[in-house]
Curated annotation (Swiss-Prot):
Pfam family, one: Shikimate_DH
Superkingdom: Bacteria
InterPro entries xrefs: Aminoacid_DH-like_N_sf (IPR046346), NAD(P)-bd_dom_sf (IPR036291), SDH_C (IPR041121), Shikimate_DH (IPR011342), Shikimate_DH-bd_N (IPR013708), Shikimate_DH_fam (IPR022893), Shikm_DH/Glu-tRNA_Rdtase (IPR006151)
Gene giving rise to this polypeptide: aroE
GO biological process: amino acid biosynthetic process; aromatic amino acid family biosynthetic process; chorismate biosynthetic process; shikimate metabolic process
Name of the protein in question: Shikimate dehydrogenase (NADP(+))
GO CC, any one term: cytosol
Record-listed NADP(+) binding positions: E87, G136, A137, G138, G139, A140, N160, R161, T162, A163, A164, R165, I225, G248
HAMAP family found in the cross-reference section: Shikimate_DH_AroE
Length: 286
């Protein structure tokens, strides 16, 4: 089987709408330079209306890309239009990583892998817990629920302002997942070992939630998939109450690694130098 690296000359992309804010080119550019690969990775903005045509051109070789990343709002359409989605993306109904094999578009979703890799790096032993609480039931929560469940967490409470959306996720991901309205947050936090914020609350310009983390288990981990600001008000509150915290930047970095390996043939490492490059860019564009 010929893979895409034999057909195309190591050119990959990230697409979304808008996309100019993406830090993915910085991440992959760092790895390309580190490995001395004469390839490229660039942002390629595509509107939702033009995305089906873009996927057709990718399949036919008209874009010159061997694959790439897909972000908001194209993840669901990327899954639907791919030829060979894997089980991860099929369960999520969304793909964020595409590559070509024999003229077919293959698809996966690395968000969940990025999430747990970040926890593994920054909160070793987190997966010895039995109960997790996930705040939010939007698209970002799906990969987190899937990844936490697949690491063996037996009880996952999904809390959302609209309980019906949380119930949709419970129905999708099986018996380990339980849906709750926001009024039940404190109750379901009791004894939990992991708290995950998958909402935009606490992002720059967004109001921060007032959450008392004291019902959590001693030594619990609180993490936020938001990484701007790096330490969100929610994480500050958890830290002040004595809990281990993990920011969301590592998820962004770790989810990028599997795609790079698909397109360029080498497995990159998420190191502190890369992390500091992204933090510096965040400071410059704050």
């Amino acid at each position: 089987m010929r893979d895409s690296r034999e057909t195309f000359v190591n050119h990959a992309f990230v697409t979304g709408y808008p996309i100019k804010h993406s830090r993915s080119p910085l991440i992959h550019g760092y790895w390309l330079k580190q490995f001395g690969i004469a390839g490229s990775y660039r942002a390629h903005e595509v509107t939702p209306e033009a995305f089906p045509e873009f996927m057709g051109q990718l399949r036919d070789g008209g874009t010159g890309f061997c694959g790439g990343n897909v972000t908001i709002p194209h993840k669901e359409m990327a899954f639907e239009l791919s030829d060979r989605p894997d089980e991860l993306s099929a369960e999520l109904g969304a793909a964020n990583t595409l590559w070509l094999e024999d003229g077919r578009i293959c698809a996966t979703n690395t968000d969940g892998r990025g999430f747990v890799a970040n926890l593994d790096e920054r909160a070793s032993g987190w997966d010895r817990i039995s109960t997790a609480v996930i705040l939010g039931a939007g698209g970002a929560s799906r990969a987190v629920i899937q990844a936490v469940r697949d690491r063996g967490v037996k009880t996952i409470h999904v809390v959302n302002r609209t309980a019906a959306r949380a119930q949709e996720l419970a129905d999708r991901f099986g018996r380990a997942v339980h849906a709750h309205p926001i009024a039940a947050l404190s109750e379901v936090m009791a004894g939990a070992g992991l708290f995950v914020n998958t909402t935009s609350l606490g992002m720059d310009g967004e109001p921060a939630p007032a959450i008392d983390f004291s019902p959590l288990a001693n030594g619990a981990v609180v993490t936020d998939i938001v990484y701007v600001p790096l330490k969100t008000p929610l994480l500050r509150q958890a830290e002040e109450q004595g809990y281990r915290i993990v920011d969301g930047l590592g998820m962004l970095l770790h989810q990028a690694a599997p795609g790079f390996e698909k397109w360029f043939g080498l497995r990159p490492v998420v190191d502190e130098t890369l992390r500091q490059i992204i933090i510096k860019d965040m400071d410059v564009h704050a």
